[in-house]
């Protein structure tokens, strides 16, 4: 008899941003696998087992979790944000695809979570109100040339762009180079939003024009949203500015 593998996302980090469905999965699971900081967000019972590992061990982690679930254990794989957005759900599906036949019989439950770009957008207005895309700047699993091509094409097409994994100790130069590329395509006035820990006590949200965007404001936990030429900033007396992208496209019938 096989067990269950839950793949959950904790959201940006605040307990209020974790979905009830995820909370139910956490309550039901016996063993938990994930990156140290994500497991730290859970209040586990004494009878629940925690197995933490490094953030570059996704496939190994998925294989161990599937092995335990195939043995009849209720296992929970923990991601930050949404598990299907640059996170563990894809690694689990890859492991099932390439793994032994018994892994395909494991009950798989993936619970959606609040991903970083949605949390950051909600804190500043509605920058994702029209067409948008999400791009990871990490070149661990894809060439940098692919990333820059996608950035350029997305900017030329008028998408709002949410950047994940914008910078790390191993690649401190990439966000700056991405900004330079985007400045060659987009107006310097396009709003750029730096959002970190949205909804948590240590939240940091900053807005500036692309022409002044400084990559040093970001770290690996920052989500950077680059507006389109249609994105607007609304100044408000006594209230934070709003950033939004209109639902209609300029020149189209409204």
From Swiss-Prot:
Which top-level group of life is the source organism from?
Answer: Bacteria
Q: Which GO terms describe its molecular function?
A: precorrin-3B C17-methyltransferase activity
Could you state one GO biological process linked to this protein?
A: cobalamin biosynthetic process
Record-linked InterPro entries: 4pyrrol_Mease, 4pyrrol_Methylase_sf, 4pyrrole_Mease_sub1, 4pyrrole_Mease_sub2, Cbl_synth_CobJ/CibH_dom, Precorrin_MeTrfase
> Which Gene3D superfamilies has this protein been placed in?
Cobalt-precorrin-4 Transmethylase, Domain 1 (3.40.1010.10), Methyltransferase, Cobalt-precorrin-4 Transmethylase, Domain 2 (3.30.950.10)
Keyword annotations: Cobalamin biosynthesis, Methyltransferase, S-adenosyl-L-methionine, Transferase
Named in its record, the pathway it takes part in is: Cofactor biosynthesis; adenosylcobalamin biosynthesis; cob(II)yrinate a,c-diamide from precorrin-2 (aerobic route): step 3/10
EC number annotated for this UniProt entry: 2.1.1.131
Q: Could you tell me what reaction this enzyme catalyses?
A: precorrin-3B + S-adenosyl-L-methionine = precorrin-4 + S-adenosyl-L-homocysteine + 3 H(+)
Kindly give the Pfam families that the UniProt entry links to this protein: TP_methylase
As for family, the record states: Belongs to the precorrin methyltransferase family.
NCBIfam families noted in UniProt: cobJ_cbiH, PRK05991.1
Protein name (database record) = Precorrin-3B C(17)-methyltransferase
Question: Which species is the source of this protein?
Answer: Sinorhizobium sp
Q: Which gene holds the coding sequence for this protein?
A: cobJ
